[in-house]
Amino acid sequence: MDRNILRACREDPRRTSTDIQLSVTSPNEPVPSRRTIRRRLQVAGLHGRRPVKKPLVSLKNRKARVEWAKQHLSWGPREWANHIWSDESKFNMFGTDGIQWIRRPIGSRYAPQYQCPTVKHGGGSVMVWGCFSDTSMGPLKRIVGTMDRYVYEDILENTMRPWARANLGRSWVFQQDNDPKHTSGHVANWFRRRRVNLLEWPSQSPDLNPIEHMWEELERRLKGVRASNANQKFAQLEAAWKSIPMTVVQTLLESMPRRCKAVIDAKGYPTKY
């Protein structure tokens, strides 16, 4: 019976004790209680945990991630100078998204089979776009309504570019992910017209983008701070964004070699970053 309980859990870590109870029950054996099942799993080192959420990465993209990481593994502060890191993120005003649980051995949080695949952006109260470089925190722009290629082009033209020229001059490289609105022909024409150099970027690679940890920094700075409406929430986000010191940026950029090595070691699967 114990062997069947462990097998059922390892076949699908998302199975609950009730699911396992149903799958191992047979006419010739007593039905184990849910409490007994949980105890057997804990003794075997399979504890209930919330799964880390990471993007589902295809084989093709895993190979591209490893190749990119190898190409940039030796890059240091000099190579990453004048690079602009950008992304969008949502911030919930009330509570969090749905909670899911899995059972996994201790120390296996980032193993692929114990991750929860995600799709970027679900719903949310406030959506923002932001960027930064090695020398300056960039603007934080609120996105109202649907973020499409036209809204994105407007952000590039009227928010990103003026800041970049004022802080980085005319020689800089822009990073963006491969979201369809970022790579649309409409936006590609803008980059060509403005002669913007783009950093080649592997798909499904938020763990290689240090701005992802900047969003986490924002969350930490606003932990426990309540907002009564979306306008107030954005005002809080913007104030917290402007208060982030450059030491945080420097620490994130110094992590790039480790991020690249982690991707290589994970064979392209999502990493802890």
UniProtKB/Swiss-Prot annotation:
Which Gene3D superfamilies does the annotation name?
A: Ribonuclease H-like superfamily/Ribonuclease H
Which Pfam families does the UniProt record give? DDE_3, HTH_Tnp_Tc3_2
**One cellular component GO annotation, for this chain's record?**
nucleus
| Protein's UniProt keywords contain DNA-binding | yes
GO MF assignments: DNA binding
User: Known InterPro entries for this protein?
Assistant: RNaseH_sf, Tc1-like_DDE_dom, Transposase_5, Transposase_Tc1-like
Tell me where in or outside the cell this protein is found: Nucleus
Print the keywords alphabetically: DNA integration, DNA recombination, DNA-binding, Nucleus, Transposable element
The similarity comment for this entry is:
Belongs to the transposase 5 family.
Function text: Probably essential for transposable element Tcb1 transposition. The insertion of Tcb1 is the main cause of spontaneous mutations.
Question: Could you identify this protein by its name?
Answer: Transposable element Tcb1 transposase
